[in-house]
From Swiss-Prot:
HAMAP family: HisG_Long
Class in the EC hierarchy, top level: transferase
Recorded GO CC terms: cytoplasm
Alphabetical list of Gene3D superfamilies matching this protein: 3.30.70.120, Periplasmic binding protein-like II (3.40.190.10)
Regulation acting on activity, per entry: Feedback inhibited by histidine.
Organism in which the protein naturally occurs: Campylobacter lari (strain RM2100 / D67 / ATCC BAA-1060)
Gene, per the UniProt record: hisG
Needed co-factor(s): Mg(2+)
Name this protein carries in UniProt: ATP phosphoribosyltransferase
Pathway: Amino-acid biosynthesis; L-histidine biosynthesis; L-histidine from 5-phospho-alpha-D-ribose 1-diphosphate: step 1/9
Amino acid sequence: MQENSRLRIAIQKSGRLSKDSIALLESIGVKLRIHDQSLIAFSTNLPIDLLRVRDDDIPGLIFDGVVDLGIVGENVLEENELERKSKNENADFIMLKKLDFGGCRLSLALPENSEYKGVESFKNLRIATSYPQLLKRFMEENNIPYKTCMLTGSVEVAPSANLADGICDLVSSGATLKANGLKEVMVIYKSKACIIQRKESLVSHKQELIDKLLIRINGVMQARESKYIMLHAPIEKLEKITALLPGVEKPTILPLENDKARVALHMVSQENLFWETMEALKKEGASAILVLPIEKMLS
């Protein structure tokens, strides 16, 4: 297959991960032209094509070198990796970045009226799941014999339909489990979205673009975790006020025009400034205290 000159990125076609992936790309300056039913979207300002596919297909597209980058949940990635390796098939990829969205957990659940005494409670039970490889690894690590009921959807109805004794499924709030008379008893895997790259080396202009995008992504993620703090402080209380500020970095101190007794303090913090701290700052004489979100950062 001929090498495409444009960077090809695979993302989930629909759902929450799709929206978050598009929002991330747009936040780093990738302008996209997307039509709802189209499987391919194009960037209008960068040489990037976006392939919108089923999330289960993304790892394989990376393993096989069909696309250059993929944004996918760690749970889907590792399930596909384990499946490939069980068949001695290629499952090579490069993990570029774990992202700050798409969080979920893979959990074991039982009917609410079941007695649970630890993982041993699953011994010899039939467990319905869409993640047989992750379940198998966990059960083997804990030496628990079990049987699998493989389902690709509606896993939570398996016990009430007498298809299985329990389930292993993704959980976010737990509301779906409760609605189906189930209780979450153990988390076996925690997942977030991540960016992966195909293992084969890329032409230089593609790799340079990926490196640039990663720098921007790091900046956006760092900005989300940071706050810009500004305040005015009396010089005589400067040491006490500085000690109250969160983080390890020292603030920038600027003189105030027409006020020789006070200075302005500016700083970026990756820790929250709680109300109690703001009240303590005010008690020490600080004023005009502002805590602002940061949209973009380059460190």
